[in-house]
Amino acid sequence: MEKLRILICDGNTEADRASFKKFVGCAPSKQFESLLKNYNSQIRTEIAFPADPGPLMTLPLGAYDGILITGSNSHIYEAQPGNLRQIEFAQKAFASGTPMFGVCWGMQLAVVAAGGEVLPSRVADCSCETPFATGVELTSYGSGHPMHHSRTSGFDVFSFHSDEVTRLPGGAVVTARNRNFIQAVEIKHGRSTFWGVQYHPELSGWDQAGFLRESARSLVEDGSYETLNHVEHAAQAISMFKAGAQISEENLVHFEGVDTNSFEFRPLEILNWLDHLVIPTAKRKFGWGGGWLQK
């Protein structure tokens, strides 16, 4: 029985991975590894750290069935060595013919590697879109796109970013957006197809609370929250947010503008990437079929 081989690329530096481990319990790459293996035990994962100096200990990128790029605390427009290494890696990934997926930083990295542009948020009242992206709407192209299969046409979702896509590369199509930002794209570049989202469909309320605590000081500095206590109060409220949970009246302030009754917690885009892009590509590329049991 065949197993998919997925390369998970953590977008964070070593220091930031340690910070996430302190506040969330693990680095983002480990979160994605757990998500994939919980979805289907037939998935084999490898984790790489393309921001780190030194050679990557991976197979040739074309040998993988999928390449998944996590979020990051980094800013792609800063000419840091780790950023430049990741751009070079993403360019090689596009040349490999392997399906790609990116979340938040992962989408921004793919946009830049394919020739687009990412800059700090230009939205006056939204320097950092967190803890939620509200009013996300599928575009006409996105409404029929398999990445968003089973997603309602309008939705709210966990989010955490202070940068935005300001220019798309050639071969890119927007599949979702809200009033402030491009929220999802497909990019066909080189030999690979990339699907990606600006928001964080992989997170639980508990995870998002950890993200808030990890970035508490920067959230106060950029004006997203008034004090560290405000960040902590928000984190406590969001940590309890899950399907069917009732929001207490005192915590409603942290969910302003969010439709908590229809909030979608499933990581749909990631699972759809596996089912609708990775698996069909692997069957064509490697000539196998019939062994994969889809859930």
UniProtKB/Swiss-Prot annotation:
Transmembrane regions: none
GO molecular function list: hydrolase activity
Record-linked SUPFAM superfamilies: Class I glutamine amidotransferase-like (SSF52317)
Principal EC category: hydrolase
Keywords assigned by UniProt, alphabetized: Hydrolase
UniProt-listed Gene3D superfamilies: 3.40.50.880
CDD domains in the record: GATase1_1 (cd01741)
Catalytic reaction list: gamma-L-glutamyl-L-alaninol + H2O = L-alaninol + L-glutamate
Superkingdom in the source lineage: Bacteria
Stated name of the protein: Gamma-glutamyl-L-1-hydroxyisopropylamide hydrolase
Active site residues per record: 104 (nucleophile), 200, 202
Organism for this UniProt entry: Pseudomonas sp
Any Gene Ontology CC annotation: cytosol
Positions of the Glutamine amidotransferase type-1 domain: 5-221
